[in-house]
From Swiss-Prot:
This protein's pathway: Amino-acid degradation; L-leucine degradation; (S)-3-hydroxy-3-methylglutaryl-CoA from 3-isovaleryl-CoA: step 1/3
Domain of life according to the entry: Eukaryota
Organism: Pongo abelii
Family under the similarity heading: Belongs to the acyl-CoA dehydrogenase family.
Transit peptide residues according to the UniProt entry: 1-29
SUPFAM superfamilies assigned: Acyl-CoA dehydrogenase C-terminal domain-like, Acyl-CoA dehydrogenase NM domain-like
Known catalytic reactions: 3-methylbutanoyl-CoA + oxidized [electron-transfer flavoprotein] + H(+) = 3-methylbut-2-enoyl-CoA + reduced [electron-transfer flavoprotein]; pentanoyl-CoA + oxidized [electron-transfer flavoprotein] + H(+) = (2E)-pentenoyl-CoA + reduced [electron-transfer flavoprotein]; hexanoyl-CoA + oxidized [electron-transfer flavoprotein] + H(+) = (2E)-hexenoyl-CoA + reduced [electron-transfer flavoprotein]; butanoyl-CoA + oxidized [electron-transfer flavoprotein] + H(+) = (2E)-butenoyl-CoA + reduced [electron-transfer flavoprotein]
This enzyme's EC code(s): 1.3.8.4, 1.3.8.1
GO annotations of cellular component type: mitochondrial matrix
Identification of the protein by name: Isovaleryl-CoA dehydrogenase, mitochondrial
Gene that specifies this protein: IVD
Length: 423
């Protein structure tokens, strides 16, 4: 396996994180607690990858996270994306020949975790770009498509997205209505997509559409297309004003006689459901790094706060109830880490199951929401004030119980997997 040093090459120095000094009580947005990766079972190269990425993000992203959330805008998105490209993390699972790093899903999860630790919103946009778009092209694109799109997506010159959901087709995604009609060497797309992460910014999008409206079952009539910004008939609506993940731009996509070359089919005509479902398992796995990062961010802020804030003549972290909160938050995070990391390792070894890809994001997402709530409680009144980041962590965490398949759908996936063993 390529080392983190080889991954980053000449692009950055090899940084090492150090444990915080005794008496560490920083209240800055980018204060860090050490992560014990000996317990997490990471190799030396994977630990170095985390340390390098974390240092870069805590310097260049974390101090901006509150303003990104408040304004619902990341003003330097394009510049930052190119920095991520220079760092080598946008194409972390892509082959080296296209500019990628040629690493695995565990490394992808680690980067997703650290970006989300610095900013949940930017972490979500990273996941949509690096996994939903780039990784789909890597896994399903032909050579011409890979050569055309991957280098610019991996360098950060282009921003990528994926579009499945529609206003009336979320969990029931195969009921989509976006229609693609073949005319000569092109397809004409008509319809809408909704809730599309990176939609307002994307230069390249993987879009699913119906090419056979009469197919039974309906899933047999879906095709995946590569759509580019600027194609005639393709436009985006205004970005949505969301509860959380603010600054990760989301919008509706509009297709009005949009002309897409037949050469832009990803995979095969009417076989898009295979691209969709196999990609969804890996999407759930990689996005599970998001809740891990949010939980770590809650701890990064809460643990120091509990050892600064005083009540009744002592630090509130010495109260038994607050010690209980710290223990609950920490053990939830560590249990989630072991599950996510081990499923990622299994996928890297060729053993990837829908049941456990659903399981890791189900469990980590619900734990992240609870950890964020516990963090708010530890902060008391300050936790309810937007000058502190605790509310942002909660609003960001809740998204992971909804996106990439709701918690309810994930439970169905797991339950059906067991039922299939007893048919």
């Amino acid at each position: 396996m390529a080392t983190a040093t080889r991954l980053l090459g000449w692009r950055v120095a090899s940084w090492r994180m150090r444990p915080p000094p005794a008496g560490f009580v920083s209240q800055r947005a980018h204060s860090l607690l050490p992560v014990d990766d000996a317990i997490n079972g990471l190799s030396e190269e994977q630990r170095q990858l985390r340390q390098t990425v974390a240092k870069f993000l805590q310097e260049h992203l974390a101090p901006k996270a509150q303003e990104i959330d408040r304004s619902n805008e990341f003003k330097n998105l394009r510049e930052f994306w190119k920095q991520l490209g220079n760092l080598g993390v946008l194409g972390i699972t892509a082959p080296v020949q296209y500019g990628g790093s040629g690493l695995g899903y565990l490394e992808h999860v680690l980067v997703m975790e650290e970006i989300s630790r610095a900013s949940g919103a930017v972490g979500l946009s990273y996941g949509a770009h690096s996994n939903l778009c780039i990784n789909q092209l890597v896994r399903n694109g032909n050579e011409a498509q890979k050569e055309k799109y991957l280098p610019k997506l991996i360098s950060g010159e282009y921003i990528g997205a994926l579009a499945m959901s529609e206003p009336n087709a979320g969990s029931d995604v195969v009921s989509m209505k976006l229609k693609a009609e073949k005319k000569g060497n092109h397809y004409i797309l008509n319809g809408n997509k909704f809730w599309i992460t990176n939609g307002p910014d994307a230069d390249v999008l993987i879009v699913y559409a119906k090419t056979d409206l009469a197919a039974v079952p309906a899933s047999r009539g879906i095709t995946a297309f590569i759509v580019e910004k600027g194609m005639p008939g393709f436009s985006t609506s205004k970005k949505l004003d969301k509860l959380g993940m603010r600054g990760s731009n989301t919008c509706e996509l509009i297709f009005e006689d949009c002309k897409v070359p037949a050469a832009n089919i990803l995979g095969h005509e009417n076989k898009g459901v295979y691209v969709l479902m196999s990609g969804l398992d890996l999407e759930r796995l990689v996005l599970a790094g998001g809740p891990l990062g949010l939980m770590q961010a809650v701890l990064d802020h809460t643990i120091p706060y509990l050892h600064v804030r005083e009540a009744f003549g002592q630090k509130i972290g010495h109260f038994q109830l607050m010690q209980g909160k710290m223990a609950d938050m920490y053990t939830r995070l560590m249990a989630c880490r072991q599950y996510v990391y081990n499923v990622a390792k299994a996928c890297d070894e060729g053993h990837c199951t829908a049941k456990d890809c659903a399981g890791v994001i189900l469990y980590s997402a619900e734990c992240a929401t609870q950890v964020a709530l516990d963090g708010i409680q530890c902060f008391g009144g300050n936790g309810y004030i937007n000058d502190f980041p605790m509310g942002r962590f909660l609003r960001d965490a809740k998204l992971y119980e909804i996106g990439a398949g709701t918690s309810e759908v994930r439970r169905l996936v797991i339950g059906r997997a067991f039922n299939a063993d007893f048919h």
